Amino acid sequence: GGHGPLWDLAEDAHSIALIEAFNNSGKPIGAVCHAPAVFRHTRHNGEPLVKGRAVTGFTNGEEDGVQLTDIVPFLVEDMLKANGGVYEKGDDWASHVVTDGNLVTGQNPASSEAGAKALLKLLA
């Protein structure tokens, strides 16, 4: 999480390859807050990995709330929608976690505990 993934994780070929390999082998994938930025370039069968999947991540409203909308290279909510994700969100700053198959995403830092529990459930 944190804003860093918008610049590094989203563009790192090794991170992208790792997420794609996990997905292709059915392993659980978890991303909370800004970490869903890694789904910017990840693919599955030539399509965005999140296409048609229920996902969440830091909302445009939350980004506006921290006054970084005009600084970040892209908005997580907009990117997930543009990549065909079925974006869901809860109230700003409240815990909200979405699980779709092997993919667990959390909206913001308040979602960390619930996101970890959802990921552990997939590992059980």
Segment roles from a protein language model:
Residues 1-124:
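Active-site-adjacent pocket-lining segments in enzyme domains
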